[in-house]
Structures are given as structure tokens and as C-alpha cells.
């Protein structure tokens, strides 16, 4: 009986967590849960004057293209320097 109850609790938690639960970095240290419709994490380079740039970390539905950009679809994957 305890096993059945535990199984039902686990299934309920898993089912409740299936919706929009992708987590991405929103800065170098902060994270966020992505809103509905945004199913990718991204880190992309935004240009400044004189050839310098900084990185923007966010959730997205369509990633930017670029040599330094990361586009991926697993939790907290947009901090690394490789795509996933």
C-alpha cells in the first residue's frame, strides 16, 4: 500500500513538472524558468563600439546566429562555450 501511494505521489509530481520547466541562465550567475513557447536556451554576443561585445543569456524560441553564440535545449545549457 505504501509503495502504491509513493508511486502515485511521484507520478503526480512528474506530471505537474512536465509543462514549461526549461531553465536557462539569464546572466552569468542567475537562472530563470522559460515562459511558454520559448523552448531553447541561448547565449549570444551583442556588439559594442570598437569591436568589443558582451553576452546576453536568455530563453528563446529562435536563436541568433553567430560564431560565439550558444543555442541549446536542456536545462542550464547556455553557459558553456559549446552548442548542445
Curated annotation (Swiss-Prot):
It is found in: Secreted. InterPro entries: Snake_toxin-like_sf (IPR045860). It comes from the Eukaryota. Expressed by the venom gland. Disulfide bonds join 24-41, 34-59, 63-71, 72-77. Its main location: secreted. Belongs to the three-finger toxin family. Short-chain subfamily. Postsynaptic neurotoxin that produces potent, and completely reversible, postsynaptic neuromuscular blockade, as well as broad spectrum inhibition of human muscle and neuronal nicotinic acetylcholine receptors (nAChRs). Inhibition is potent or moderate, depending on the receptor (alpha-1-beta-1-delta-epsilon/CHRNA1-CHRNB1-CHRND-CHRNE (IC(50)=2.56 uM), alpha-4-beta-2/CHRNA4-CHRNB2 (IC(50)=1.8 uM), alpha-7/CHRNA7 (IC(50)=7 uM), and alpha-3-beta-2/CHRNA3-CHRNB2 (IC(50)=12.6 uM)). Acts as a competitive antagonist of ACh. This is Three-finger toxin 3b.
Amino acid at each position: 500500500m505504501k509503495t502504491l501511494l509513493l508511486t502515485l505521489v511521484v507520478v503526480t509530481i512528474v506530471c505537474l513538472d512536465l509543462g514549461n520547466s526549461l531553465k536557462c541562465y539569464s546572466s552569468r550567475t542567475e537562472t530563470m524558468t522559460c515562459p511558454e513557447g520559448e523552448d531553447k536556451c541561448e547565449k549570444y554576443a551583442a556588439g559594442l563600439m570598437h569591436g568589443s561585445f558582451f553576452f546576453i543569456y536568455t530563453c528563446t524560441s529562435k536563436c541568433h546566429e553567430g560564431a560565439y553564440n550558444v543555442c541549446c535545449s536542456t536545462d542550464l545549457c547556455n553557459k558553456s562555450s559549446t552548442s548542445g
